[in-house]
Amino acid sequence: MFNSISGILSGKTTDSVYVENSGIEWEIFVSALALDTLGTVGKEVKVYTWLYHREDQMRLFGFPNQAERSLFLDLTKVEGVGPRQALKIMSGLNSSSLEKALEEGDIDTLQKAPGVGKKTAQKMILALKGKLTNLNKVSSKGQASVSCEYEDIVT
């Protein structure tokens, strides 16, 4: 529904940022690592978003770039990992470490993320190894590779 929100970063908490745009202040939930990436209060910011809607609540989740949003959405595809858990995982591991651990099946690294035990790490690897849809993947030749999601269509 919302791809991104640009505006003035008007505040930060431990798990969210506030972005003021055209007289509306948006509360956007972000990972702890994204808090530092998004800049300082009072500055212009662009936050890529994903809207979570249930019958009893709506939450807007934010990311400093589209690649992190894509990784977040991949994590939410894992059984037992909802949006809040995915954000916690991304607070404990940066996106490159997380992607590497998933691709290599590194359970020990995944368990360093908050709330991830051995079973959850195994589920994450089983569900996502070789299937990450990150838009910014680059092949060893320096060319952008085709997203795994669409690779079957191309070949």
What are these regions (language model features)?
Residues 111-114, 124:
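Glycine- and Gly-Pro-enriched alpha-helical subdomains that act as flexible
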Residues 124-155:
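Strongly charged, low-complexity linkers/loops
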Residues 65-67, 100-104, 144-150:
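Short acidic alpha-helix initiation/capping motifs at coil-to-helix transition points
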